[in-house]
Amino acid sequence: MWLLGLFCGLSLFLLGGCGGGGGGGGTPYPVDRAVSVTNKGNYYEIVLNYNEGFSPFEVGQEYGRKVLATVPGYESALDSYLAELAEKTDFLYQLFLSRAEEIRKNLDATYVEELEGFADNLITENKLGDGRLSVDEFFLLNLVPDVARATACNALAVWGNRSVTGKTQLVRSLEWFSGSQEQLSRVNAVTVVKNGTRSYAMVGYVGMLGMLTGFNSRGVFAAVLDSQTGSEYSYTGCRSYTFDLRRAVENAATLSDVADDMRNPQRNYTVNHLIFLADGREAWVLENNFRGLGTNVSRRVRTANSETNPGFNPGIAWGIDESIAAVNSFVLLGNTDNHTILPANAMRWSSLATQLRLAGEQVTGTELKSVASYSSTGKPGNRDQGDLYSTHTAQLLYFCPETLELEAFFRNPSVAAPLPDKPTFQAVPVTF
C-alpha cells in the first residue's frame, strides 16, 4: 500500500509539473496551436500566434515543421529559385551567402530566433541546387531583397475628395522574378501575426518573414519599392530593410512612426529604396536615398504637397491632388534622378497619372483596380512601354486602411500560363 501511494503521488507530481508542450509550464495548449498553414488555392494563409506566450523560436520551429509537411515541394522549389538567382554559379552562390551572413548579424534578436526556429527543420550543408534548403540558404531566401536585386513595383493611393469613400484607397503591384518554373508563384502567402495590440499582416511568400507589403491592426500600411541609383553596392554593417520595416509597422500607431524609424541615419541599408505608406486619411512615400548623385541626397518623406514644396526634380510632374504615386525612382528635388533617365520609371509614372485622370474626380475601388491593371496591349505588357500590368507582375493588391479590406491578385504557378489577360482580384479576409 505504501508503495502504491508513493507511485500515485509521484505520478501526480510528474503530470502536474509538465507544461502543455512547446510553450513551457502553464501553457494552455501545445505549440501545434501556435501556427496554422492553410492552402487557399492560389495563396497560403499563414497564422503565427504569439498571443499564448510561445517564444519566437517555438513559433518559427512549428512554422517550419508545418510548411515542410503541408506545402508540396517547398524545399526543392525554393532551392532551385536561389540557384537561378545565383545564375547556377558557385561564385555568385557563395557571394550571396556571405552577404546574407553579414546582414544576418544585424537582424533584431526576436526575428533571428524566429528564423532559427524555422531553420531547425532544415539541413546544415550548403550545396548549390541540391534540392534541399539549408539553414544558410533559408536566411539567404529571407534576405533576397537586401542581397540580390531584381525587382520592380508601383503603387498609387487616393483619399479625401478624390476617393468615393472619402478615405484612403490604394493599389500596390509587386513585380518580382518568380523563377523559370514559377517557384515563388507556388508559395504566395498572406501571413497574419497575432500579438495583441501589435498584430499585423504581411503579403509575400511562405517562409519569407521580412515585410514586402504589410499593415497592422491600427490600419498603418507599408510596402517596399526598389530605387537603384547605380551607386556601389555595400553590405558591411548593413541591416535588412524588410525586417526593419516589419518591426516598424509592428510598433507603429502613425505613418510618422514608420517613416521616422526607417529613415534613422543610424541604420545603414544595402541599397536605396522607397517605402509607400498609407493610413485611412492619406498616403506618403519615404524616399530613402542615402547614396547616389544629387544636390540634396537625403532620406525624406514625400507627401501630396511636395510637388510645390520643396518641388520635384526637373522634368517630373504629377499635378493630381489628394493622390500620390510611386514607381522605382526618387522624384524629390535634390535626390538622385533615376526617374527621367529610365523609361520603365518615367513611362509607368505617366501611365499612373493618365489612367487616374481618366477615372474622374472621384475614384471607386473598381476604377482604382482598373488603373493598376492597365496595359496598352490588353494583356500583360512591357514596363518600358509604361504598362502597369506586365509580364513580370507577381502580386497586385487593393487595400483600404480604414476598414482593413484587402483584395489580391496572385500570379499563377502555371509555367505555360502564369498570367491571364486581365487580373481578377479576390477578397482576402484578414482577422487579427
What function would you assign to each model-found segment?
Residues 10-33:
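Bacterial Sec-dependent N-terminal signal peptides
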Residues 1-5:
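Bacterial N-terminal signal peptides that target proteins for export
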Residues 19-20, 60, 166, 219:
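Glycine-centered flexibility sites
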Residues 10, 26, 210-217, 302:
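Intrinsically disordered/low-complexity terminal segments and short unstructured peptides
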Residues 140-244, 397, 406-408:
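Internal mixed beta-strand/loop scaffold within catalytic domains of large alpha/beta enzymes
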Residues 26-152, 249-432:
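C-terminus-biased signal that marks the final domain/tail of proteins
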